[in-house]
Amino acid sequence: MSNVTPMMQQYLKIKSEYQDCLLFFRLGDFYEMFYEDAKEASRVLEITLTKRDAKKENPIPMCGVPYHSADSYIDTLVNNGYKVAICEQMEDPKQTKGMVRREVVRIVTPGTVMEQGGVDDKQNNYILSFVMNQPEIALSYCDVSTGELKVTHFNDEATLLNEITTINPNEVVINDNISDNLKRQINMVTETITVRETLSSEIYSVNQTEHKLMYQATQLLLDYIHHTQKRDLSHIEDVVQYAAIDYMKMDFYAKRNLELTESIRLKSKKGTLLWLMDETKTPMGARRLKQWIDRPLISKEQIEARLDIVDEFSAHFIERDTLRTYLNQVYDIERLVGRVSYGNVNARDLIQLKHSISEIPNIKALLNSMNQNTLVQVNQLEPLDDLLDILEQSLVEEPPISVKDGGLFKVGFNTQLDEYLEASKNGKTWLAELQAKERQRTGIKSLKISFNKVFGYFIEITRANLQNFEPSEFGYMRKQTLSNAERFITDELKEKEDIILGAEDKAIELEYQLFVQLREEVKKYTERLQQQAKIISELDCLQSFAEIAQKYNYTRPSFSENKTLELVESRHPVVERVMDYNDYVPNNCRLDNETFIYLITGPNMSGKSTYMRQVAIISIMAQMGAYVPCKEAVLPIFDQIFTRIGAADDLVSGKSTFMVEMLEAQKALTYATEDSLIIFDEIGRGTSTYDGLALAQAMIEYVAETSHAKTLFSTHYHELTTLDQALPSLKNVHVAANEYKGELIFLHKVKDGAVDDSYGIQVAKLADLPEKVISRAQVILSEFEASAGKKSSISNLKMVENEPEINQENLNLSVEETTDTLSQKDFEQASFDLFENDQKSEIELQIKNLNLSNMTPIEALVKLSELQNQLK
């Protein structure tokens, strides 16, 4: 440290306090970065990496960005998962002797971005915390940009992961280290996990008497937010407690497979349910819509209340169109209020706020003309006339972006300001008159009076006009020489400059003070503005539901008391939209308490997956309170939706396609109830034919005898189609296709009964496989059919009465048969004694205590995976 300059000593001291951040260290007009920070930042930002003290033995790596354009660089770093500590000069270098005092004024993290361009208008920017006291877990989350703050608690890790998936935070804060397995699961949502073991002594306004663990989670979250932001956050609302069980549950895989908010292939909004349903006109409405998709309701009363409003908007087209026009003039009130509280609001933001609240009376009057018994929100709308008057009387309609350059306030708003502005205006008039007079006096037509911040006002004469000109004769004093001109001042000009600049400086300083006062006045309306924003966002969502219902010919769903699902001429809303409406083939579906399993067969590409997905998506839309793409729709209210669709390795945790498939199936089989919906697509294809067939049958039997969940189960195992003889709750259906002159024609129509052909070779022909491969496959298929018969039998897989578990006899497997090729020596080498020592390890004890006779194959596989993870 002895060879380090005082400035670098200051840098190193501050950096030591923010080791997990990139430190933006203010030096004049730049933010500089040094050492490893500089290397990282230069790589990510693609800026030049240079060196400080380049001639010394150990030069310091450094890079920098201009302070006036720093926001875009910070956004880039934060979007790449970095935290940025902003260190400012707290004193004016011109007025400070010695080292300028510097300190970190804010830490920008992925979950605390507040700048207008740093967050997506249509997405919440959540930061989440959770604390664990097994078996109990409490979780709290906040959007700092809007002020939303919520908390909940539960007793299982599965719900924790479901909540994290639903909330989709950009940052997670914890108070202790977590298992690698849990960390991997969270990293599927966000890479930024912050461990904050030590909290400040500050106690935030959270009720700690209701629930200790929820208080701790919220306290942890708010402490971290205040630690990073270091300023007023009064816009953060009082914490709202909710219960996860009040909403339909869907895990990460269900939301991904159904493509609710992000498409699997493009990883974008386009092609998703959110994309389809978003006819909102405000950013607040768009964010609310995503929340509603992520959390469908399970309260029939709440669902029907939303549907009643959609009915009202659907029946009043003209009023709805007018409402959309009004909403189009409403800006993002939630985030505008957040910036007011945060202190980074500008005058243009307040003009946007003014325009937004000026639409509230129009919206209220419009809703008053409709059914007020249905539109309960009309009574909650509050025209903020007092705030509107304040903003109307104060700010000019088109103020500058900066609040420190003047030009913000109307004439007549403040008497003192008017006097300063008048003096400045008169001074500039005098300057214009002086310029005309000097041109006439000197005879130089190009003479001009200009200004810069270094020299103030001056008279400029080009060098061509100086040949026969004697400055002293006119009282001119040389101020600056340029290559093509000379600049002069006069006593008269200098005297007037002091008056003009003095008035301008005083006006700008006063305007900033007045703006701060105005900002504080607007801050008093925070709670009322947030309430209006919530109402407007809900109305925006509901009019959007009515808009798409009319545009795409949707119908109002009804909900059965006897848990029947009956869809008449149902369509997949997204697939229908991207293709010609008239080309889409609608299908029916009926599941009830007697028949609650559809076993779906049919060739690849025939539409089995689309059919299953559309049933799930229609259920989600209905429980959001939206119309659905059906001619008629009667639905139960589902508590959960489980899916197993598609093939995907979990590369992060090293799980194979089959293992992922089994884990997802395990969740459905373990947690599904008779009020759940299960979508299983081609279960068992990731293993051998007989293993897959056995597992598929076992799962169907388990659902039929245990959970009774409504289930759509597609398969290519045609042997399973005879299960309807043993399972009254199962019905065979198929997606029809015809073969005409060797060509396969997909009808996309779901019909009763099983299909007797997979048409695999015909599908391969559609994919333009080489003709030689197709011909050879047909020969091999003929040989198989000749030797084994067209239809296989599942006689070896018959159910055992009253025996839901699969044992060795059910599977018709023999340990002796599978091991007869192994020698005794092979067995001796493989069968080492796990329990040789008196002192047993925890994992050894777990293995020893397993009751294998009472475990299904899936449970055994999942348990083995858990033990493997513990050993990693």
From Swiss-Prot:
Q: Name one GO cellular component term.
A: cytosol
Q: Which GO terms describe its biological process?
A: mismatch repair
Asked whether the keyword DNA-binding is assigned, the reply is yes
Positions bound to ATP: 602-609
Q: Name one GO molecular function term.
A: damaged DNA binding
| The UniProt record lists the keyword DNA damage | yes
Q: Which UniProt keywords apply?
A: ATP-binding, DNA damage, DNA repair, DNA-binding, Nucleotide-binding
Chain coiled-coil ranges? none
Function summary: This protein is involved in the repair of mismatches in DNA. It is possible that it carries out the mismatch recognition step. This protein has a weak ATPase activity.
Spell out the PANTHER family in the cross-references.
Answer: DNA MISMATCH REPAIR PROTEIN MSH1, MITOCHONDRIAL, DNA MISMATCH REPAIR PROTEIN MUTS FAMILY MEMBER
Q: Which family does it belong to?
A: Belongs to the DNA mismatch repair MutS family.
Protein's UniProt name: DNA mismatch repair protein MutS
What organism is this sequence from? Answer: Staphylococcus aureus (strain NCTC 8325 / PS 47)
Recorded name of the encoding gene: mutS
